[in-house]
UniProtKB/Swiss-Prot annotation:
Organism per entry: Alcanivorax borkumensis (strain ATCC 700651 / DSM 11573 / NCIMB 13689 / SK2)
Record-stated family: Belongs to the GPI family.
Reaction(s) the record says it catalyses: alpha-D-glucose 6-phosphate = beta-D-fructose 6-phosphate
GO terms under biological process: gluconeogenesis; glucose 6-phosphate metabolic process; glycolytic process
Enzyme Commission number(s): 5.3.1.9
Catalytic residues (positions): E356 (proton donor), H387, K511
Gene: pgi
UniProt protein name: Glucose-6-phosphate isomerase
Localisation: Cytoplasm
Pathway participation: Carbohydrate biosynthesis; gluconeogenesis; Carbohydrate degradation; glycolysis; D-glyceraldehyde 3-phosphate and glycerone phosphate from D-glucose: step 2/4
Transmembrane regions listed in the UniProt entry: none
GO molecular function: carbohydrate derivative binding; glucose-6-phosphate isomerase activity; monosaccharide binding
Keywords associated with the record: Cytoplasm, Gluconeogenesis, Glycolysis, Isomerase
């Protein structure tokens, strides 16, 4: 059973937080540092390989204590117990959310470990050159065909961990990703590949996703024509296609033999699926040892979330500070700013994880909420962001909370020895910029410690709150811990807001309407019950296509 919750905005702690926000809302971040000596020590949290500095958030010690009380009042401890007990915390689909079980090393996950062993066999054969194409060639390229969680997580993690050393004798293939339904990505990827040495991963929880199946069909047709084979050739499908899904019957119907099928379960949400067989592209990048380290890091954070008191609990404190910003300071946007180029795809991954989970306006009880929930999440690699939208952060009119990510150690591998000094200098430059931007956003021109009077157009007001996360180094284990941290943060926020973070009904109706719009595009002059704007656009497209 899941705990019941009362009306959030009528709680006594919520009302106290509203009063405190009115009292402290006009304070500048610099005031907090003056009023609370040793503030950084009180607002820094650590876990294995990760430090989180919340001191540049516009939250006082009093506000923090009240927020912790809010977590207690909302029953976060009972909700956490329900999550890890396998209760049906996904109330609209009557499902549990046991993605945490995918990284549990205990015997209760025997079925999961069985799939990991199948993954291990596939990964070893590919990396050691033993997986052969239908004409006997070793695999050099792997194409991941998937969309949403079947791409965002694997793409992000594989890119981040690409420099992870492999075992002796292992050679990682080149990875490619195709998700767009218009065919542009799959077309560009395939025209650069040799079908004799290409392996295609078809990743779809339902194995009915239109985007994925159209791309998979295109890849199968390309492979068959290039090799002079029929599209249902069993040897071609056995040597060049692997399916990953919760629906084995549908994989079989498409043509993927059972020996090439990896499975996961309906209680694994797409945005939580990189820990499952959906993470095969990650394993092909770091090897199975590296993939197991990724799982171990996530399990470390699971234990941290379950065992640490709230005021020492990284996911919970991140969630509570976000709630403070959104609901009490009216800051409804957050920029994710990694100052390590390997985390290039982390902002896009978090956009899905957070906005698809908590972008809800209806409570678990089915009532409209009367408070804000998930903020708009966006971001870019820090140095690029400085030349793109930092102008708005520093001198614009929108309050934005920022999240900086950096690594303490980099370029220690022997592979970089030829340019170690230069690369270490670049790493220091990146970290210096990260620290400088967080200081400037917090304190404005006061950070310059200068008495010069500046004209208005050169002024920096500061007072933009930020969190800084420092990884000891970027490794499979620390990345696993970081990603699980964000998952638990999202869950904790959902508990505070009383919403279901494990469904995504907001993406479903558009798929139905798209089917209707296909008929409109095919015959825009026919009789259709559709709005004038959409009909006019369909006719415009038809007109342009008729003249090409």
């Amino acid at each position: 059973m899941v705990p019941e919750q009362n009306d959030l905005t009528e709680s006594s702690v919520w009302l106290q937080l509203e009063n405190l926000a009115r009292e402290e809302g006009s304070l500048h971040l610099s005031d907090f540092f003056v009023q609370e000596l040793g503030r950084c020590a009180h607002f820094c949290l650590e876990s294995d390989g990760l430090l989180v500095d919340l001191s540049k958030q516009r939250v006082s010690s009093h506000a923090r204590d009240l927020l912790v009380s809010l977590a207690d009042e909302r029953g976060l401890d009972r909700w956490s117990e329900a999550l890890f007990a396998g209760a049906e915390v996904n109330c609209t689909e009557n499902r549990s959310a046991k993605h945490w079980l995918l990284r549990d090393p205990s015997d209760q996950a025997a079925e999961i470990h069985g799939q990991l062993e199948i993954m291990d066999s596939i990964v070893s054969r590919v990396l050691e050159g033993q997986w052969r194409g239908v004409l006997g060639d070793a695999i050099t390229d792997v194409v991941n065909v998937g969309v949403g969680g079947s791409e965002l997580g694997p793409l992000m993690a594989a890119f981040a961990l690409h420099s992870t050393p492999l075992a002796e004798g292992e050679v990682r293939p080149s990875l490619h990703f195709a998700s767009s339904m218009d065919g542009s990505q799959i077309s560009q990827v395939l025209q650069e590949l040799n079908p004799r040495t290409t392996l295609v991963l078809v990743s779809s929880k339902s194995f009915t996703t239109v985007d994925t199946l159209h791309n998979a069909n295109t890849a199968r047709s390309w492979m068959a024509r290039a090799l002079g084979l029929e599209m249902d050739n069993e040897a071609m499908l056995r040597c060049h296609f692997i399916g990953i899904s919760a629906q084995p019957d549908k994989m079989t119907a498409w043509g993927i033999p059972s020996t090439n099928q990896l499975q996961f379960w309906d209680w694994v949400g797409g945005r939580y699926s990189l820990w499952s067989a959906i993470g095969l592209p990650i394993a092909l990048t770091v090897g199975m040892h590296g993939f197991r380290e990724l799982l171990a890091g996530a399990h470390d954070m699971d234990l941290h979330f379950r065992q640490r008191p709230w005021h020492e609990n990284i996911p919970v404190m991140l969630a509570l500070v976000d709630v403070w910003n959104i609901n009490f300071l009216d800051i409804r946007a957050r920029a994710v700013l990694p100052y390590d180029g390997r985390l290039k795809y982390l902002p896009a991954y978090l956009e899905q994880l957070e906005m698809e989970s908590n972008g809800k306006s209806v409570s678990r009880n089915g009532d409209p909420v009367d408070y804000h929930t998930c903020p708009v999440i966006w971001g870019e690699v820090g140095p690029n962001a400085q030349h793109a939208f930092f102008q708005l952060l520093h001198q614009g009119t929108q309050p934005v909370a920022c999240e900086f990510l950096m690594t303490a150690r980099r370029y220690t591998e022997s592979a970089h020895s030829g340019a170690a000094v230069e690369l270490e200098g670049q790493h220091a430059l990146s970290n210096a910029n990260c620290l400088a931007q967080s200081r400037l956003l917090a304190f404005g021109e006061q950070a310059l410690d200068s008495t010069l009077a500046l004209p208005a157009y050169k002024r920096y007001r500061g007072n933009q709150p930020s969190t800084t996360l420092v990884l000891d180094e970027l490794s499979p284990r620390t990345l696993g811990s970081l990603l699980a941290m964000y998952e638990h943060k999202v869950f904790a926020q959902a508990v505070i807001w009383g919403i279901n973070p494990f469904d995504q009904w907001g993406v479903e109706m558009g798929k139905v309407i798209a089917t209707d719009m296909l008929a409109v595009l095919a015959d825009p002059d026919g009789a259709h019950e559709v709005d004038d704007s959409s009909l006019s656009l369909a006719r415009h497209i038809a007109c342009k296509q008729a003249t090409q």
